[in-house]
Regions:
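Helix-loop-helix
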Residues: 51, 160-174, 244, 248-317, ...
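Short intracellular "coupling" helices and adjacent cytoplasmic loop segments at the cytosolic face
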Residues: 95, 103-127, 131-133, 206-230, ...
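Transmembrane helices of ABC transporter permease
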Residues: 15, 19-32, 75, 142-196, ...
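An intracellular "coupling" helix at the cytosolic face of ABC transporter transmembrane type-1 domains
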Residues: 114-115, 131-140, 144, 148, ...
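A short amphipathic helical element positioned immediately N-terminal to and/or at the very start
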Residues: 2-15, 125
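Alpha-helical segments in transporter systems
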Residues: 10, 18-43, 72, 87-91, ...
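ABC-type nucleotide-binding domain
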Residues: 331-332, 337-581
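Transmembrane helix-loop-helix hairpins at lipid-water interfaces of multipass membrane proteins
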Residues: 2, 20-82, 162-167, 278-282
């Protein structure tokens, strides 16, 4: 059992320590009442039997029987009521812990760098935020409801057994260390199996998410059989870990019960001998045997809780790994980036996605305010990396990136990104109305401003033709608008932000030629007098750029206007001719 993870998980109880204290007190009173009952019942049995014998087996003290029954009923009701209260309050505490964990995960996602999401499986992240949280919720709710009463009942029964008859109590106690020893051995195997189960579940969820996202590609390349084989391999691995986890955790209770039953029989035999010799009353034997039966309940609960706790800790460890992941650099007292004109300079910039491999070295780019700069080059040349560095999705290794002479590293990243509008090749729409999706870039925008942005992006016409217009509900997977129309909405979203700098990363790659011409016309108007970076593979779309940067292996190897680069008959000219041959 991972004690560090357990200690950290228990630290989430601190805000509710008053309630936990109340639960502990309530549980203590409930257990005190509960463990008294077998002894009271045993004493009552002795009293009734002695009076019956004293009457020469002629009469039963019914009045005494009813009095005892009434007392027992009151005690049972009180114990049950207190037990209910304890479970109610502890369920609230468990829900509070899950709420705080979910809140921390949500806040953590906002502080994680883009690098983290690029390096992690999306399905595994979703599994940590959903499946692992649910595992903790299910396990903690059950464990927290049982933990106090189980521990207190266990020790309470042992104490009461010693008050009834010490020799029989010692005999009854002998099976407990053996049970705990065996449970401990099984628990180690169970813990490993639960940890493997959670890790494999994350990988399986990642595979399912990947398959679902790319199901068209899977079908297009007839990959179904191989995909099923890969899924089956992961599923078999999960099955192997899952059955082991359940098997080992399930062994604990029957083994504990078996040992308890053996000891129970032994206590009954010895108790009978003691009664025959007058060392214990009939009621005393009854009480001891009842306690032996009752102690199997907390022992069984303890075995069950060990399995649940191991499952919970395996899930908690994965969640804490996420919460402990390296965050974006603290911005401290950094200032807001002031209003900008749009001069952008890369000065001797070096960068690598990993420390071992340098992608860019001594990169220098000079863009004047209001210029439209196109970045072209083969796949892997570093085009998108330039944008990632400008947006500070990744931080440079050395050098400086300046806007209007301000080093962007010296200012709050939010203030930088608020001045830049991005339209990416991969469209992304959120669950909500079209109006809400466009307004995402500026939540305080009026309806009129939303419509104006849509008109500038040539999206207004198709939006108004939809049944609910701007109130049409869409999701990323929606099929009531085309891929090109989705791209138009993302462009409208960027326009609404009214940024000082525009970034268009293959913004027209998902639209038809007619729509591309509309977008290009809108872009020419919108980008007028604004610094714009355009990444494009279709070189025909960037002829009017003020400057074209040709990149290869992370460096700018050519730059100039479209006509100047064609006249050089260099790398760009070769790319351009290749597209039309």
């Amino acid at each position: 059992m991972n004690k560090t993870v357990l200690k950290r998980l228990l630290s989430y109880l601190k805000p509710d320590r008053v309630i936990v204290t109340i639960v502990l007190v309530v549980s203590l009173i409930s257990v005190i009442l509960d463990v008294q009952l077998p002894k009271i019942l045993g004493d009552a049995t002795t009293l009734i039997s002695e009076r019956y014998i004293a009457s020469n087996y002629t009469s039963v003290d019914l009045e005494g029987v009813f009095a005892i029954a009434k007392t027992l009923a009151i005690l049972y009701i009180l114990a049950a009521g207190l037990n209910f209260l304890g479970k109610y309050f502890m369920s609230r505490v468990a829900s509070d812990i899950i709420y705080r964990l979910q809140k921390e995960i949500d806040e953590k996602f906002t502080r994680l760098p883009v690098r983290y999401f690029d390096e992690q499986s999306r399905g595994d992240l979703l599994s940590r935020a959903t499946n692992d949280i649910q595992t903790i919720d299910d396990s903690f709710s059950q464990v927290s409801n049982q933990i106090f009463t189980t521990v207190l009942t266990f020790f309470g029964i042992i104490i009461m057994m010693f008050t009834v008859n010490i020799p029989l109590a010692i005999i009854g106690f002998l099976g407990i260390p053996l049970s705990l020893f065996i449970i401990g051995l099984i628990g180690k195997k169970s813990s490993t199996a639960f940890a493997n189960r959670q890790e494999t579940t994350g990988r399986l969820n990642g595979y399912i998410e990947e398959y679902y996202a790319g199901h068209e590609i899977v079908k297009a390349f007839n990959y179904e059989d191989r995909s099923q084989a890969e899924f089956q391999a992961l599923n078999d691995e999960l099955y192997e870990h899952a059955w082991k986890a359940q098997f080992f955790s399930g062994l604990m209770f029957p083994i504990s019960r078996l040992i308890n039953n053996i000891v129970y029989v032994f206590v009954a035999i010895v108790g009978g001998l003691f009664a025959a010799s007058g060392m214990i009353t009939i009621g005393g034997i009854q009480a001891i045997l009842q306690y032996m039966r009752n102690i199997s309940q907390p022992m069984g609960d303890a075995a069950n809780m060990i399995g649940l706790t191991q499952s919970m800790l395996a899930a908690a460890e994965r969640i804490f790994e996420l919460l402990d992941a390296e965050e974006m650099e603290e911005e401290g007292d950094k200032e807001e980036l002031p209003a900008i004109v749009g001069d952008v300079q890369f000065k001797h910039v070096s960068f690598g996605y990993t420390p071992e491999v340098t992608l860019m070295e001594d990169l220098n780019i000079d863009v004047k305010a209001g210029e439209t700069v196109a970045i072209v080059g083969p796949t892997g040349a570093g085009k998108t990396t330039v944008i990632n560095l400008l947006m500070r999705f990744y931080d440079i290794t050395s050098g400086a990136i300046e806007i209007d002479g301000h080093n962007i590293q010296d200012y709050k990243v939010d203030s930088l990104r608020s001045k830049v509008g991005m339209v990416l090749q991969d469209t992304w729409l959120f669950k909500g109305t079209i109006r809400e999706n466009i307004r995402y870039s500026r939540p305080d925008a009026t309806d009129e401003e939303v419509v104006q942005a849509a008109k500038q992006a040539f999206a207004d016409d198709f939006i108004r033709k939809l049944p609910d217009g701007y109130d049409t509900y869409i999701t990323e997977e929606t099929d009531n608008i085309s891929g090109g129309q989705k791209q138009l909405l993302t462009i409208a979203r960027a326009i609404l932000a009214s940024p000082s700098i525009f970034i268009l990363d293959e913004a027209t790659s998902n639209v038809d030629t007619r729509t591309e011409m509309q977008i290009q016309k809108a872009m020419d108007h919108i980008m007028e007098h604004k610094t714009s970076f355009v990444i494009a593979h279709r070189l025909s779309t960037i002829r009017n750029a003020d400057k074209i940067l040709v990149m290869q292996k992370g460096n700018v190897i050519e730059q100039g206007t479209h006509e100047e680069l064609l006249a050089k008959q260099g790398f760009y000219a070769g790319l351009y001719r290749a597209q039309f041959e």
